[in-house]
Each structure stands twice: as structure tokens, then as C-alpha cells.
Design a protein with these regions (language model features):
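Conserved catalytic core of the tyrosine transesterase superfamily
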Residues: 1-294
Length: 294
């Protein structure tokens, strides 16, 4: 386990990913009778079936477990033969929940305080992931270039996101009140320690409380605002490549899901029924009685 931790750290994996991977491997080790470095294909297939069948875990959770085991056997133990025995389960495409711009305004307006309000505005205006927002530093805000820098985003990649004038105004108001020193959103309950970032749980609570106060019945999470950011940009005319860069997607295919969510793109597509001329005979029966065909 220590070798795996060292390899994860060496490869600059996020702290949350390291914790999740080690936890998944620990569970696997407790499940199998064989020493972990002597595990064979049958053990892996049995565990895979156990996760999906007996425990009935969500597919995403099973994928995380498979990722952890692949890392252990392929990257740490150098057993590349294990790759075929650790297939990813097939995932269904589930369209994420999207709020209308009006609902987003309601949500932000229902924030408990200025701290929460600024968090919600930043999430929606930048499309940041929850962990990325937590790690934001005051120095990452470039008001001269009107850009927000995301350092070491998912996959360890830096990127920049345009900074809106409205968000900059909100951040300035927030800065005058909070006076953050290092992290833009400092942690602890009373937000007094500038050397620690806010926890992801606090971000989730800020969104959850605002959802309840706004009377929104949809299931809203911090990631919902990321989906709203991308979908509303697409509906405003932004191209997929630009959205991909702002979201930090390594693959354009991950961004194409928003085509399914954009009303503008769906409604702009000509319906085939509109393209044909249907004859309308004068003697078309108008009776409500249905007759069986002869």
C-alpha cells in the first residue's frame, strides 16, 4: 500500500483520488483470500461480479474501483497482463440535471450569506469543478487580463477561464469583506485561517442550502452549476472547442454531451415531419369510432 501511495504522489494525483484509490484497494485486499501480489484473473473477475451483482454498486463507483486496481497491478506491480482481466463496465449515458438561467438566478439569490453567494457565482461563471474552486488562490484572479487561472486541474493540467465583469465585481465586494490572504475561499468554520482552503463539503452545503431556500425541486449539486455553465454557453452561441478548453476536458467527446442538453441546438434541427407535404383528402373519415380493417 505504501508503494502505491508513493507512486500516486509521484504522479501528482489529487489528494482525494489518492484517498479513494487506497480505500478501494484496501477493500479488495480484505475481500480476497489470496495475497494481493498473487491474485489471479479468477479473483479479479469474481470481485468485479461481486461489486456489480452482490453489492449492486453504481457503475461509476465500480469504475473507480477498477481504476484503482488497474493502477495497482499495471503501474505499481508491473503486471500488464492484468489489463484484460479488469475491463470497465459499460456505462449508460445519463443526461445531467440542468437549471434554466432563471433558476440559476433564483439559486444564487437564495444563498445564505455573501460567502456562499460568491461561491455559487464563481461556480456558475467559471464552470470549475468543486475541488478546483476549493484550491483557488487570490493570486489566480487576473483582473488586468480578465482571466481566472486554474492550477493543477483534473489530470494535473493548468488552464485559464475568462473572468466575467459581473463576477469580478462580486469578487471585489467579497474581498473587501473577507480579506482572504492565500486561498480565495479560506477554510474552517469561522473562515479565519487563510492558510487552509475551504472543504468540498462546505461547497456542497452552500449549494444544497440555497436549493432548498430557492424552492427548487431538482437535485442540484456543485457539479450541476458546471453543467449549466457549459449548456448555457452553448445556447449563447459558444463553440464546443472553446467550451472544452474552459471545462478542462482532455477529450472533445466528453463535451459533446452538452449538445443533448442545449435547447437551441435541438430546436434548430429541422424536424423531419416539417419537411414533408401530407395529402389531406376531402373525404377523410372524422368518425371517432374505430373500424377493424377488412
Amino acid at each position: 500500500m505504501e508503494r502505491m501511495r508513493e507512486e500516486l504522489v509521484r504522479r501528482n494525483y489529487a489528494t482525494t483520488t489518492i484517498h479513494s484509490y487506497l480505500k478501494a484497494v484496501e477493500h479488495f485486499r480484505n475481500h480476497v483470500d489470496t495475497p494481493i501480489d498473487e491474485v489471479g484473473p479468477d479473483d479479479l473477475r469474481s470481485y468485479h461480479a461481486y461489486l456489480l451483482g452482490t453489492r449492486k454498486l453504481a457503475v461509476n463507483t465500480v469504475v473507480l474501483n477498477i481504476c484503482a486496481l488497474r493502477f495497482l497491478y499495471i503501474k505499481v506491480l508491473k503486471r500488464r497482463d492484468m489489463k484484460e482481466d479488469l475491463p470497465y463496465p459499460k456505462q449508460r449515458l445519463r443526461l445531467p440535471v440542468i437549471l434554466s438561467p432563471g433558476e440559476v438566478a433564483q439559486l444564487i439569490g437564495a444563498a445564505r450569506n455573501l460567502y456562499h453567494r460568491t461561491i455559487l457565482m464563481t461556480l456558475y461563471s467559471t464552470g470549475l469543478r468543486r475541488a478546483e474552486l476549493c484550491r483557488l488562490k487570490v493570486a489566480d484572479i487576473d483582473s488586468k487580463r480578465m482571466m481566472l487561472r486554474v492550477v493543477q486541474g483534473k489530470g494535473g493540467i493548468d488552464r485559464e477561464v475568462p473572468l466575467s465583469q459581473k463576477l469580478l465585481g462580486a469578487l471585489r465586494e467579497y474581498y473587501r469583506w473577507m480579506r482572504p490572504e492565500t486561498y480565495l475561499f479560506p477554510g474552517t468554520v469561522n473562515h479565519s485561517r487563510a492558510d487552509k482552503p475551504i472543504s468540498e463539503k462546505i461547497v456542497w452545503q452552500a449549494v444544497h442550502e440555497a436549493t432548498i431556500h430557492a424552492g427548487i425541486k431538482k437535485r442540484v449539486t456543485p457539479h450541476t452549476l458546471r453543467h449549466c455553465f457549459a449548456t448555457h454557453l452553448l445556447e449563447s452561441g459558444a463553440d464546443l472547442r472553446s467550451i472544452q478548453m474552459m471545462l478542462g476536458h482532455s477529450d472533445l467527446e466528453a463535451t459533446t454531451v452538452y449538445l443533448h442538453l442545449s435547447r437551441r441546438h435541438l430546436q434548430a434541427t429541422a424536424n423531419p415531419l416539417e419537411q414533408i407535404v401530407i395529402p389531406n383528402p376531402a373525404n377523410l373519415a372524422l368518425s371517432r369510432r374505430l373500424r377493424k380493417p377488412q
